[in-house]
Amino acid sequence: MKFRFKLLCVTLCLALSAAAFTGCSGQGASSASGSAASASATGEETHEPGLFIDGQKVEADPVLTFNGEEVSFDLYRYIFLTFCDRVAGDDSSYWEDMSNSETAQAAETVKLYTLNNALSFPMFRQWAEELGVSLTEEETAEIAQVAADWEGYFGSEEEYENFLAINHLTKELAIQMELDTQLSNKVLEAAYGDAIKADVLENFVHVQHVLIQFEDAEADDHSAELAKAQEVLEKAQAGEDFNALMEEYNEDPGEPEEGYYFPTGVMVQEFEDASFALQDGEISDIVETSYGYHIIKRLPLDESYIDTHLLDLAADSSVNEQMQQDMDERIRAGEIWYCDVYDQISPATLF
């Protein structure tokens, strides 16, 4: 659990392909639309992939170009249907009634998000050329090996192919998206890495903590949790290893082993105030928030960690807003071509 009331992030859906493989459980996404990309009870798509207008499959490849560089139908379809799935959630009938004004508005929003994210692929490739950034042979080979290993997560080739189909992917597209993801990361690090690092070193704090969660946040009596927190505090003050105390007592399942890096305005106020008030190596008294009781230890900022997690840290960096503005401006400044049937793409026509 991270005690954030906001999360500013770099809005790149270039990582969607990697997210699709997280866990590799073999379970499919929810249906993209009630009539257009419905899933059966077994999780398999029941409609042939493609764009169907008036019942006829039509060619739409490429769907777009950006400064002359193509956005393939497969890429556009993947992004569009993935957004449709996320909007629909577990409601397999969500997209059935496109005459519903709320559904129609959601479809327009999905289409806008899809456009922006689809265009980011050629935008980043062109930006990489400007900066002289590229993937090394070793990086490309590593991605190819990872792609070759993906099938090993599944019991058979058929299961793997089914997983790809349910998630609107092909083998080739999954590999290309991973290549693009790594390239975009290198572009952002080249363009903003120094600024991100400087911001982290100046404005971030690094802490670990032990959380004793409230069993019932609404209860009037938290004496049992307070007693447990007091026990942890006494052990920490006596010099016991803080990592060992985290392993034994911590009830924050989202806390990484190295703890949290964050600036002001990210964590809940009590946690933030206590963290910034500490000196490196110092341990707080018991800090109460709406989540429970915390014992916080401040640690030095680790430059090697910062160097290898620049884009993760960028999400909370003041540089993030400038990054997003620059990416948006590059998209707006580009020359965009749309295929003839672009206006007819919707959750009711794209499968």
PLM regions with names:
Residues M1-E108, L112, R330-F351:
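Short, low-structural-confidence N-terminal segments
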Residues G26-A32, G43-V58, E158-A224, E247, ...:
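PPIase-associated folding chaperone regions across multiple families
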Residues V71-F80, A106-L115, L119-S120, F124, ...:
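Stable alpha-helical elements in mature extracytoplasmic
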Residues S99-Q105, L119-F121, R125, S134-G155, ...:
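Acidic helix-start/capping segments at beta-turn-to-alpha-helix junctions
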